[in-house]
């Protein structure tokens, strides 16, 4: 079964609501984020979402223009840093409080729209 953004969000909410799971998983997640290094290149987590699928394209079209331009700038800057094998200075790294999901709400909205459309397309009228 392929993972959907909705199922991933529900799993994350469940983990955060369960104290025992949160106590174990959250520190591991923070360490994973630190080791992945995307914040050291000025990226935010939603910048890493694959944009080659229809759902992501829909979410990107719904993104406000200023956020879209900022996203493109961060990605281009990260590519340049990658090509030159450098990282940003520590004061320019993305801070955890700045790494908020800006694309995820649009992805969830687009996914709900696709699901609703599919349900309506397959609707059978009973008499």
Curated annotation (Swiss-Prot):
It comes from Kluyveromyces lactis (strain ATCC 8585 / CBS 2359 / DSM 70799 / NBRC 1267 / NRRL Y-1140 / WM37) (Yeast). The keyword Electron transport applies. It holds the Pfam family UCR_14kD. Component of the ubiquinol-cytochrome c oxidoreductase (cytochrome b-c1 complex, complex III, CIII), a multisubunit enzyme composed of 3 respiratory subunits cytochrome b, cytochrome c1 and Rieske protein, 2 core protein subunits, and additional low-molecular weight protein subunits. The complex exists as an obligatory dimer and forms supercomplexes (SCs) in the inner mitochondrial membrane with cytochrome c oxidase (complex IV, CIV). The keyword Transport applies. It is found in: Mitochondrion inner membrane. Keywords: Electron transport, Membrane, Mitochondrion, Mitochondrion inner membrane, Respiratory chain, Transport. Gene3D superfamilies: Cytochrome b-c1 complex subunit 7. GO terms for biological process: mitochondrial electron transport, ubiquinol to cytochrome c. GO terms for cellular component: mitochondrial inner membrane; respiratory chain complex III. Component of the ubiquinol-cytochrome c oxidoreductase, a multisubunit transmembrane complex that is part of the mitochondrial electron transport chain which drives oxidative phosphorylation. The gene is QCR7. Belongs to the UQCRB/QCR7 family. Its main location: mitochondrion. It is a peripheral membrane protein. This is Cytochrome b-c1 complex subunit 7.
């Amino acid at each position: 079964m392929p993972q959907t953004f909705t199922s991933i969000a529900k799993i994350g909410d469940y983990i955060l609501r369960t104290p025992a799971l949160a106590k174990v998983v959250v520190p591991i997640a923070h360490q994973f984020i630190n080791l992945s290094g995307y914040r050291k290149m000025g990226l935010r987590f939603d910048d890493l979402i694959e944009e080659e699928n229809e759902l992501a394209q829909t979410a990107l079209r719904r993104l406000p223009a200023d956020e879209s331009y900022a996203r493109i700038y961060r990605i281009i800057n990260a590519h340049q840093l990658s090509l030159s094998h450098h990282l940003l200075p520590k004061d320019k790294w993305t801070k955890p409080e700045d790494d908020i999901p800006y694309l995820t709400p649009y992805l969830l909205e687009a996914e709900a729209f696709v699901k609703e459309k599919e349900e309506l397309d397959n609707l059978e009228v009973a008499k």
